[in-house]
Amino acid sequence: MNKKTIWITGGSTGIGKSLAIKFANEGWNVAISARREELLNQISEKYENISSFPLDVTDKLKCKEIFNQIRNKYESIDICFFSTG
């Protein structure tokens, strides 16, 4: 059985970060996005099943690109949680 995947925007701090860690601890694949790449990398380095995808959600083309990158990496996205701004 494949692991489920969640994509969390605003995943570098606050609620987004807390949710990312919670889902990672439950065994999910977690993709996190935010503008601050250094914070994303700090989180993804601590958790094997968290991957970071830097993103400014105001850039519609980049959002689509990141969505496709995540889907290609994990085959599907089961939940999208938008915790931005």
Model-derived features: where do they sit?
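Conserved hydrophobic beta-strands of the Rossmann-like cofactor-binding core
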Residues: 5-8, 80-81
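Conserved glycine-rich cofactor-binding loop
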Residues: 10-14
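Aromatic pocket-lining residues of Rossmann-like dinucleotide-binding sites
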Residues: 23
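Conserved glycine-rich Rossmann-like NAD(P)H-binding loop of the short-chain dehydrogenase/reductase
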Residues: 26-43
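A conserved hydrophobic alpha-helix of the Rossmann-fold in NAD(P)-dependent oxidoreductases
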Residues: 40, 63-70
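The beta1-alpha1 cofactor-binding region of Rossmann-like NAD(H)/NADP(H)-dependent oxidoreductases
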Residues: 55-65
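Conserved NAD(P)H cofactor-binding loop of Rossmann-fold oxidoreductase domains
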Residues: 83-85
